[in-house]
A protein has these predicted regions:
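C-terminal substrate-binding subdomain of Rossmann-fold SDR/epimerase-dehydratase oxidoreductases
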Residues: 133-229
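A glycine/serine/threonine-rich, flexible loop-to-helix segment
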Residues: 69, 122-130
Length: 229
């Protein structure tokens, strides 16, 4: 609150969150504390101080799994989270919407695909795999590697948030989507190629992969329609 007043803040973009899905299965209380209680605390500050826009950064995972033959989801699709991380982000969204309606907090919600880019913390799959390859270590692959994700470059994500900051409408939800959907196995293969390692066949890829136990529940894919933005 003191920071908002001291610097006369008129816009808040709320990125802060615990985001490592694997950790949420074994330490879900921290995710509730950070993602839900933390968002609630920030909303209280914003309600008291007053801002022009409160942009809440959520995730495509709040929609839950999208079947292989399913259509890309629009912003009005049901929220059906399947892991503790996604549930905490969906719960945070409910607080944001409640404060928008009850206290006129000028909120906007953004749900994006997986973002990647330089200097990303290595709990995320692309920097994690890159770091392992730099060290000459094997890549850990959940299950059979057929799960797919869509990836969004950090610079493109920044452009989307800049657009929402300047043109986004209060009360709206915006998907920030990518069409770059690849399986985890294909991601392994692509990174091996970038490091000059053999990846022409499955057998060559598997030489650099160790299969690990899958998550208690692992959404096969996510797919959002970002045409609104």
């Amino acid at each position: 609150m003191d920071c908002l007043r001291k610097h006369n803040v008129d816009t808040v973009m709320h990125f802060a969150a615990q985001t490592h899905v694997d950790l949420s299965f074994g330490n879900s209380n921290d995710f509730t504390s950070t993602n839900v209680v933390g968002t609630h605390a920030l909303l209280e500050c914003v309600k008291s101080h007053g801002v022009n826009k409160f942009i809440h950064v959520s995730t495509d995972e709040v929609y839950g799994e999208v079947k292989d033959d399913g259509k890309d989801l629009l912003e009005d699709a049901l929220l059906l989270p399947t892991n503790p991380y996604a549930a905490s982000k969906a719960a945070a969204e409910m607080y944001v919407e409640a404060y928008r309606k009850s206290f006129q907090v000028p909120a906007i919600v953004v749900r994006s695909n997986n973002v990647y880019g330089p200097h990303q913390f290595p709990e995320k799959v692309i920097p994690k795999f890159s770091m392992l390859l730099q060290r000459g270590q094997q890549l850990s692959l959940h299950g059979d590697g057929t799960h797919t994700r869509r990836y969004l470059y950090a610079g493109d994500a920044a452009d989307a948030f800049d657009t929402i900051l300047h043109k986004g409408q209060v009360g709206q939800v915006y998907n920030v989507g990518s069409s770059d959907e690849i399986s985890n196995f294909t991601l392994c293969s692509m990174l091996l190629g970038q490091f000059g390692l053999s990846n022409e066949t499955k057998e060559e890829v598997y030489k650099h992969v160790v299969h690990c136990e899958d998550r208690p529940f692992n959404d096969h894919r996510y797919a959002v329609d970002g045409s609104k933005l």
